[in-house]
Amino acid sequence: SAQRRCAYAFALDQGYEGIVTIDGNDKDDPEAIPRFIEALKQGVDFVQASRFIAGGIAENTPKSRDFAIRFVHAPMLSLFSGFRWTDTTQGFRAYSRKMLLDTRIAPFRDVFVTYELLAYLSYRAPKLGYLCLELPTTRRYPKGEVPTKISSFKGNLSVLLVLFRACFGFYSTN
């Protein structure tokens, strides 16, 4: 999204060597942030939170979302990127400065309006040989009504279209 791109640009302009992002919806436990920073310090270029690997916790995840992530989104990005992802839809991530400034990735383009950048980076970074890692995290949905910006058939179809475009190189620079 434009907000993500602005945040990345600001952090890079300030000289930061890496960026950690976390969704502002209070579903992710920020206790994992120091592990994300440590992974960047150890040379990892892309750290992705995962509630589905050993040590991760998925609490009250809506069944339809759980199914879509485990059996559509993550497997498809894994197949096309060459890296085994398990949890590709959330924004709890960390990126190295080197990766974000790579002109072959070029994340500062106007084509990234909604969720495109999240899917694209999961596809493109491993394809270019960047060191990627998933770390276990906790993601808790509240009981009852699920707060989300993705709703209805139209919203889910949009996410699926973004996924296909990312996997088939639509957002790639070359």
Regions found by a protein language model. Give the residues of each.
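Short beta-strand-to-loop acidic/aromatic patch adjacent to the donor-nucleotide binding site
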Residues: 16-27
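Residue-level detector of anion-binding/catalytic polar loops
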Residues: 17, 45, 131
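Short glycine/serine/threonine-enriched helix-capping/active-site loop
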Residues: 22, 47-50, 135-137
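Catalytic donor-sugar/metal-binding loop of nucleotide-sugar-dependent glycosyltransferases
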Residues: 109-110, 122-139
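Acidic donor-binding loop at a coil-to-helix junction in glycosyltransferase catalytic cores
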Residues: 112-120
